[in-house]
């Protein structure tokens, strides 16, 4: 869909994903999508209930992050071309931000306000959201906010559990069309942050 719609995507994968789906990563790179780091082992950096605490040391954080970049380098993804880091679970604190910056990277995160990130949920989960509900949350947010979705980073998962038969990515073409009708231009992370 992204190729057909000429939309640049930004993909953040773990080292394990790069190992298992190297051919997909190569194809995404060949198609000029951004490929970035999402950690090697998808570690939880801070407790859910005490965000100001840490579950990792600086050394373990950096070792894990560097391992992710090594897997990327094995696929021809140059670190200089991948300066953005999306933390696992999109959960981090000030220490993680500082350590990321000290490593010469920019920590980014999805923009909160929609349910796009719930596209991984399955019907047996208490936080399950249908694809229709997710799509509507995005369009409602756009209509209700003064700045709409300008500068917004929507987080979608490239794949989901087979138990989720209602795949949100099947609604992607519709979402792209609707956003374009509303006057949006979908751009790369680099372009977004250059214009910021």
Regions found by a protein language model. Give the residues of each.
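Metal-dependent polysaccharide deacetylase catalytic core of the NodB/CE4 family, i.e.
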Residues: 3-129, 147-160
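C-terminal domain-boundary segment and adjacent tail
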Residues: 5-9, 19-20, 162-196
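Well-ordered, non-membrane alpha-helical segments in soluble/globular domains
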Residues: 65-66, 131-136, 168-173
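Compositionally biased, intrinsically disordered low-complexity regions enriched in proline and serine
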Residues: 70, 142-146, 185
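A short, acidic, amphipathic alpha-helical segment used as a generic capping/interface helix at domain edges
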Residues: 131-147
């Amino acid at each position: 869909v992204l190729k057909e719609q000429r939309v640049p995507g930004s993909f953040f994968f773990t080292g394990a994903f790069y190992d298992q789906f190297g051919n997909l990563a190569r194809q995404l790179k060949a198609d000029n999508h951004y490929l970035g780091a999402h950690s090697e082992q998808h570690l939880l950096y801070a407790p859910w209930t005490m965000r100001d605490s840490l579950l990792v040391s600086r050394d373990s954080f950096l070792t894990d992050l560097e391992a992710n970049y090594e897997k990327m380098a094995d696929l021809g993804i140059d670190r200089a071309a991948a300066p953005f880091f999306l933390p696992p679970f999109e959960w981090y604190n000030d220490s993680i931000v500082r350590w990321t910056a000290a490593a010469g990277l920019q920590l980014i995160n999805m923009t909160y306000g929609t349910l796009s990130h719930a596209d991984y949920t399955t019907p047996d989960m208490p936080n399950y959201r249908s694809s229709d509900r997710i799509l509507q949350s995005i369009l409602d947010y756009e209509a209700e906010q003064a700045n709409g979705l300008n500068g917004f980073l929507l987080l979608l998962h490239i794949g989901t559990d087979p138990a989720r038969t209602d795949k949100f990515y099947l609604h992607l073409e519709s979402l792209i069309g609707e956003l374009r009708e509303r006057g949006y231009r979908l751009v790369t992370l680099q372009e977004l942050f250059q214009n910021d």
